[in-house]
Amino acid sequence: MAAAAASRGIGAKLGLREIRIHLCQRSPGSRGVRDFIEKRYVELKKANSDLPILIRECSDVQPKLWARYAFGQETNVPLNNFSADQVTRALENVLSGKA
């Protein structure tokens, strides 16, 4: 799981500085992201207490996972119509450097 991967320090080896999740409070395309946050955010944050994990809600925004690395490098993964499990896999890919 993403929390387990991050707790092993995988993201730290890549210079991961911050994770941001953008989503809409109401859109059907963000439903899986909302489910992910409700079910897995606490575990993820506990396993990564030193890593900023930011949740940004905005009306009509397309859901995305953003990762900021050392030297200001950023990557993003679109999460539109993803299930909570697909969001978890996307986060695992970011933490392992595959995204």
From Swiss-Prot:
Keywords: Acetylation, Disulfide bond, Electron transport, Membrane, Mitochondrion, Mitochondrion inner membrane, Respiratory chain, Transport. InterPro entries: NADH_Ub_cplx-1_asu_su-2 (IPR016464), Ribosomal_mL43/mS25/NADH_DH (IPR007741), Thioredoxin-like_sf (IPR036249). The keyword Membrane applies. The modification N6-succinyllysine is found at K64. It comes from the Eukaryota. Pfam families: L51_S25_CI-B8. It is found in: Mitochondrion inner membrane. One of its GO terms (cellular component) is respiratory chain complex I. Belongs to the complex I NDUFA2 subunit family. Complex I is composed of 45 different subunits. This is NADH dehydrogenase [ubiquinone] 1 alpha subcomplex subunit 2. It comes from Gorilla gorilla gorilla (Western lowland gorilla). The lineage of its organism: Eukaryota, Metazoa, Chordata, Craniata, Vertebrata.
